[in-house]
């Protein structure tokens, strides 16, 4: 496994394009995230092909179901050889514990999703959830930590307070990373790599600023250089 802090979101709608794009990257400089659309389309064979290219794979399926179902899904996902999988912290402690126990003795890391980065205070109010996104994220992150998970997904804006509360060994995975001149797209809580690293982020998920770049490898190298400078 490499020690890169970057996870490239492989958000493509067909397997061929995804694999061709991945082949343009350097597996020493990043890991790869495969989400629902691409995995539903291409299945486990895609994971195997990405691993043959040398990539550690984050299988981003955000499991959220009854404990037994999530535990079984986590076990199967781990058998694919992926580096990391995730579940929704809103599934509660029983579900989180079941997922954690399903991976005991296995190499696959387990993290929890707190709040989606597209959600803001108005979205929470609409769902009847009181409190700011920061408060809800902290509550869910600490629940995941108590249940033995390796880390959580959170925005870079919440990373500083979470790092202080959760300690140095708890992974903070931050999507919504953009350079200062990138489009915000549909992410409400975004940050630059420098801000994310200084706030305590462990890994940065970067999608469109790399996948839509005219020169993806150059963009990846630029982001890596910024991270190294921030460390």
UniProtKB/Swiss-Prot annotation:
Pfam annotation, one family: OMPdecase
Active-site positions on this chain: 62 (proton donor)
Domain of life: Bacteria
Keywords: Decarboxylase, Lyase, Pyrimidine biosynthesis
UniProt GO cellular component terms: cytosol
Biological role: Catalyzes the decarboxylation of orotidine 5'-monophosphate (OMP) to uridine 5'-monophosphate (UMP).
HAMAP family cross-referenced by the UniProt entry: OMPdecase_type1_B
Name recorded for this polypeptide: Orotidine 5'-phosphate decarboxylase
């Amino acid at each position: 496994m490499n020690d890169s802090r970057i996870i490239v979101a492989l958000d493509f709608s067909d397997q061929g394009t995804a694999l061709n794009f991945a082949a343009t990257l350097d597996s020493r400089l990043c890991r790869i995230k495969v989400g629902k659309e691409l995995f539903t389309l291409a299945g486990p064979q895609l994971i195997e092909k990405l691993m043959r290219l040398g990539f550690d794979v984050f299988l981003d399926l955000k499991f959220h179901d009854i404990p037994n179902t999530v535990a079984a899904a986590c076990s199967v996902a781990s058998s694919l050889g992926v580096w990391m999988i995730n579940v929704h912290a809103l599934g509660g402690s029983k579900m989180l514990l079941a997922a954690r126990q399903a991976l005991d003795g296995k190499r696959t890391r387990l993290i929890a999703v707190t709040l989606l980065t597209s959600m803001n205070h108005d979205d929470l109010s609409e769902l009847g959830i009181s409190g700011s996104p920061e408060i809800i994220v902290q509550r869910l992150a600490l629940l995941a930590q108590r249940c033995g998970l390796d880390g959580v997904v959170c925005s870079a804006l919440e990373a500083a307070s979470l790092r202080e509360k959760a300690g140095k060994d708890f992974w903070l995975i931050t999507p919504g990373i953009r350079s200062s001149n990138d489009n915000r797209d549909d992410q409400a809580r975004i940050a630059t790599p420098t801000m994310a690293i200084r706030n305590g982020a462990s890994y940065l998920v970067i999608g469109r600023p790399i996948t839509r770049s005219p020169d993806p490898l150059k963009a990846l190298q630029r982001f890596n250089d910024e991270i190294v400078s921030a460390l």
